[in-house]
Amino acid sequence: MGFSTEQELVDLFKISFSSKFNIANKRVLEEVSLGFGIADLVVTELKDSAEIVKREKLTSIDINVYQIVKNKKKVSLDVVTTITGIKKQDIIKSLEKLIEYSFVKRMDSYYVFSNKYELSFKKNIAFEAKLRHWKKALMQAYRYKWFADYSYVVLDEAHSKAAIENLPLFEKLNVGLLTISIDGVIKKYYHPKKQKPLDPTMQMLLSEVLMYQ
């Protein structure tokens, strides 16, 4: 006998996961959407509050503009507008905000990278929960590697046999595999290696969500 719903599984996992994951100063987010599906849970280890600068939240446009200036080091307004396809007035608004917060400097008719954005967390772990359909869960969890240091599939233990038999695929994709029983017992079948997230923009989006939720 297994769980009746995925939400039932997620709710119990939230209570029980600390037995397998020792994370200090943690924050737990549900239904996290950053552009590659919706992660059921994201658990982050926050930096000390003294390290987090309080300011107005950066939008996705602000972050995209920041990344362009950072990568190019020196860029004109027209180039940023062309790359993003966003209205010039919105780009100007983002650049003004980035200048105010010292991420960017104005130099004549150009914008120059100034200071690196500091993430609000030390690490984060994404979880995709499923009652069955382990292949679908695996592919979804793999997408979370764009922003997560670690990504896991969490399956109902009652329906996990096929996934366990295909453990080499989890290892190949570096996605962890956990099962949870209806009495809250979590078993870890594969612990992925820490891997640098693939998309800095998505990491920044998550960081902003954490600071301003």
Regions found by a protein language model. Name each.
Residues 44-51, 94, 115-126, 134-135, ...:
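Active-site beta-strand-loop-beta-strand hairpin of nuclease catalytic cores
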